[in-house]
């Protein structure tokens, strides 16, 4: 029985074709019920990681920690649990794993005692020099208990000989490279750090006189906090006694946030550059519509990721927008008696065709991205089986040809369909009548730029261009995902 359940869970995960953001972070300082506020913030960030969650709190004398498998709402919904997390200061973390064993010790936040006092660390992102740093630390006598690069950061902080914790943090971040957002808790401060290019997001909020740090603004909304600003690229914010100090230790660089925050990662109601992610995605759909070259009867999104782009597409062209695919939002948490028939259903466990809506229709099917193409193939077949006359696939971003090194769960280049096939070959593989990706310039225009600056790109867009703002130090080749994710904040293995 256990074997069958494991097979089913693996199949469910494999039929999620999206790139996966790896973790959400949250922190609050000097606030009543800090652990409860942190649990609410993590709940709002649940889309950034569903496999584990943790909170560390501080009451002025002691630190308290709770780490659990699964969703925030299933673990931090009881008063008894939250009462164990005493104090007016807390940080939290949602975990998304990629590979490796699933153990409680790998769930964040991590905690360590240093000669300047205790420190808790929650990390979203990935270090591109994590293996090199880890090997050097081990040579110097460090003992590691996990395979997470977050522990590497903790070890670097603990190893620093500087007397103040904030100086130890500065020492550590000078040694790390990659895309990262850190939220840390010490005996008298809340600290936020964002990488020099601002690849991973981190925002500042205010709840009365208390400060809040979070991966997205939606986590501020749920607790009634007001958005103040983004943590700037390369900035360290030190929050003590309800006062915020900005520290900028790095040479100035042009900010390059991850393009997939706009396309998919951020929750639709989160604010990115003064617009919600939903508005950005509608604008992406409008640009996709401007590049349209086929006629059809209806526009159908792949739910939920394609909804906003499909709506913008349909509104611009004055076409009918229809929910031709219905998503089962509960499949990942439902116990299903395993059988060969169930295991063979695959994508139907998550999606089903709305037959009367699509029968005898020429359909424009819109999704946010195409990675391996396996699910697109099954969805197109599902629509044809339900009676669709034609299925034209539109993708709301350019072709994904390159893997990620900054904390996103991507396949190797060998597994990325667009890296190995032409547009016509991909179209044939997924079984569509036609296939079109949004142009790179169209994507930049949708997000608010006149065009891409090829000398200093405004976004981290290496998925499409191979232009990495931070070059990987650790040479991993085609084994990149297997090796690097073992040391990533997402896997925490």
Residue ranges and their predicted role:
Residues 1-233, 238-296, 302, 390:
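Conserved short alpha-helical segments that host acidic/polar catalytic motifs at enzyme active sites
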Residues 33-35, 98-99, 129, 199-200, ...:
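Flexible loop/turn segments at secondary-structure boundaries
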Residues 76, 146, 151, 321-332, ...:
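A conserved beta-strand->alpha-helix junction
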Residues 122, 185, 193-194, 205, ...:
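Generic beta-strand/beta-sheet core signal
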Residues 142, 162-163, 293-297, 315-322, ...:
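Secondary-structure transition/capping motifs at alpha-helix termini
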Residues 171, 219, 226-227, 231-235, ...:
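Phosphate/diphosphate-binding loops
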Residues 173, 188-189, 224-230, 381-493:
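PRPP-dependent phosphoribosyltransferase catalytic core
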Residues 318-363, 374, 401-408:
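Short, glycine/charge-rich flexible loops or terminal/linker lids adjacent to PRPP-binding catalytic cores
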């Amino acid at each position: 029985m256990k074997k069958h359940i494991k097979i089913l869970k693996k199949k469910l995960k494999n039929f999620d074709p999206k790139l996966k953001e790896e973790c959400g972070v949250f922190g609050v300082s000097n606030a009543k019920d800090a652990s409860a506020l942190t649990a609410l913030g993590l709940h709002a960030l649940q889309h950034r990681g569903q496999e584990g969650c943790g909170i560390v709190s501080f009451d002025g004398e002691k630190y308290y920690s709770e780490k659990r498998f699964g969703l925030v709402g299933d673990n931090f919904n009881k008063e008894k649990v939250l009462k164990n997390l005493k104090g007016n200061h807390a940080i939290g973390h949602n975990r998304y794993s990629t590979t490796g064993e699933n153990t409680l010790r790998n769930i964040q936040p991590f905690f360590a005692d240093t000669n300047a006092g205790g420190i808790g660390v929650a990390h979203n992102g990935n270090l591109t020099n994590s293996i090199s740093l880890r090997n050097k630390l081990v040579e110097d006598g460090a003992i590691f208990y996990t395979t997470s690069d977050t522990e590497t950061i903790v070890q670097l902080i603990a190893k620093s000989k500087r007397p103040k914790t904030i100086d130890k943090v500065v020492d550590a971040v000078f040694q790390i490279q990659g895309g990262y957002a850190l939220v840390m808790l010490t005996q008298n401060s809340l600290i936020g750090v964002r990488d020099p290019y601002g690849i991973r997001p981190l925002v500042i909020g205010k709840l009365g006189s208390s400060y809040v740090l979070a991966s997205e603004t939606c986590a501020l909304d749920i607790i009634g906090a007001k958005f103040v600003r983004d943590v700037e690229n390369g900035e360290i914010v030190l929050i003590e006694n309800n006062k915020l100090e900005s520290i900028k230790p790095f040479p100035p660089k042009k900010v390059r946030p991850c393009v997939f925050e706009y396309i998919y990662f951020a929750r639709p109601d989160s604010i990115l550059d003064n617009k919600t992610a939903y508005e950005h995605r509608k604008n992406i759909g409008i640009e996709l519509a401007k590049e349209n070259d086929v006629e059809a009867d209806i526009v159908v999104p792949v739910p939920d990721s394609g909804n906003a782009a499909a709506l913008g597409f349909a509104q611009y062209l004055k076409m009918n927008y229809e929910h031709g695919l219905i998503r089962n939002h509960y499949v990942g948490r439902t116990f299903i008696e395993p059988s060969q028939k169930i295991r063979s259903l695959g994508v139907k466990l998550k999606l089903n065709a709305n037959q009367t809506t699509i029968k005898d229709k020429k359909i424009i099917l819109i999704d946010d991205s195409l990675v391996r193409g396996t699910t697109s193939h099954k969805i197109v077949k599902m629509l044809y089986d339900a009676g669709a006359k034609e299925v034209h696939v539109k993708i709301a971003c350019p072709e994904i040809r390159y893997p990620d090194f900054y904390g996103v769960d991507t396949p190797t280049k060998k597994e990325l369909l667009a890296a190995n096939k032409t547009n016509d070959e991909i179209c044939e593989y997924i079984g569509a009548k036609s296939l079109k990706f949004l142009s790179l310039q169209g994507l930049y225009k949708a997000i608010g730029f006149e065009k891409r600056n090829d000398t200093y790109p405004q976004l981290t867009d290496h998925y499409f261009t191979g232009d990495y703002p931070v070059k990987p130090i650790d040479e991993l080749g085609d084994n990149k995902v297997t090796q690097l994710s073992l040391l990533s904040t997402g896997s925490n293995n």
